[in-house]
């Protein structure tokens, strides 16, 4: 993506995790990339971002592309020692460690560009997929058997697994409505069915 700042088009730097480091590439010619690690806004006196990258740590990384006359664009990333990058999960939030752990366990994938929408709702497809990943069973490579769950979707295999396990049953019209938000009562029913099958009182 790019933004217009005082008539100048600035492209967003490319961020990636590589060998335990945060690598940031600045695609803008005649500009500098400066950063801070204390949460403050980078200035022209801040350190230049090293081409070798920064070691992962738990904290805030703010970086700014400085073009001519001091104009530029600032970006913020939240990092964890476990090697994860977040755009919208502050390290001082009450849920940071839980989301960081869920990502480490491959339960969460995010919505792209290191964003996770922590305040967003959870739909029925997301919940079943997270549950399937948490249980760790092999997932069938087949359609789920619902009229609105087609093959090849990111949640199809998890839906098929949950249906075969009789954890989900869908609606009378044969649909599952995967994009609909899941309610707490629906989550409790699915969890209860799973725990009964596993002979457990908790996951």
PLM features: what roles do these ranges have?
Residues 1-83:
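Short, compositionally stereotyped local motifs that mark structural "simplifiers"
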Residues 21-23, 32, 43, 50, ...:
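Residues in flexible loops and secondary-structure boundaries
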Residues 78-96, 104, 109-158, 164-185, ...:
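Feature responds to low-complexity, polar/acidic, surface-exposed segments characteristic
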């Amino acid at each position: 993506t790019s933004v217009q700042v005082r008539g100048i088009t600035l492209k967003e730097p490319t961020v990636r995790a590589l060998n335990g480091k945060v690598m940031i590439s600045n695609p803008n010619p005649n500009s500098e990339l400066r950063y801070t690690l204390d949460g403050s806004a980078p200035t022209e006196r801040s350190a230049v971002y090293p081409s070798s990258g920064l070691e992962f740590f738990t904290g805030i990384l703010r970086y700014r592309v400085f073009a001519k006359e001091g104009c530029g664009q600032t970006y913020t990333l939240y990092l964890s020692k476990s090697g994860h990058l977040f755009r919208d999960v502050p390290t001082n939030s009450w849920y940071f460690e839980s989301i960081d752990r869920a990502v480490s366990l491959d339960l969460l994938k995010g919505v792209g560009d290191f964003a996770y929408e922590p305040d967003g709702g959870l739909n029925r497809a997301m919940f079943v997929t997270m549950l399937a990943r948490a249980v760790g069973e092999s997932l069938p490579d087949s359609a789920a058997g619902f009229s609105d769950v087609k093959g090849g979707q990111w949640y199809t295999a998890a839906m098929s697994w949950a249906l075969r396990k009789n954890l989900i049953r869908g609606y009378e019209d044969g649909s599952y409505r995967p994009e609909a938000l899941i309610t707490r009562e629906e989550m409790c029913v699915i969890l209860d069915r799973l725990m009964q099958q596993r002979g457990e009182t908790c996951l």
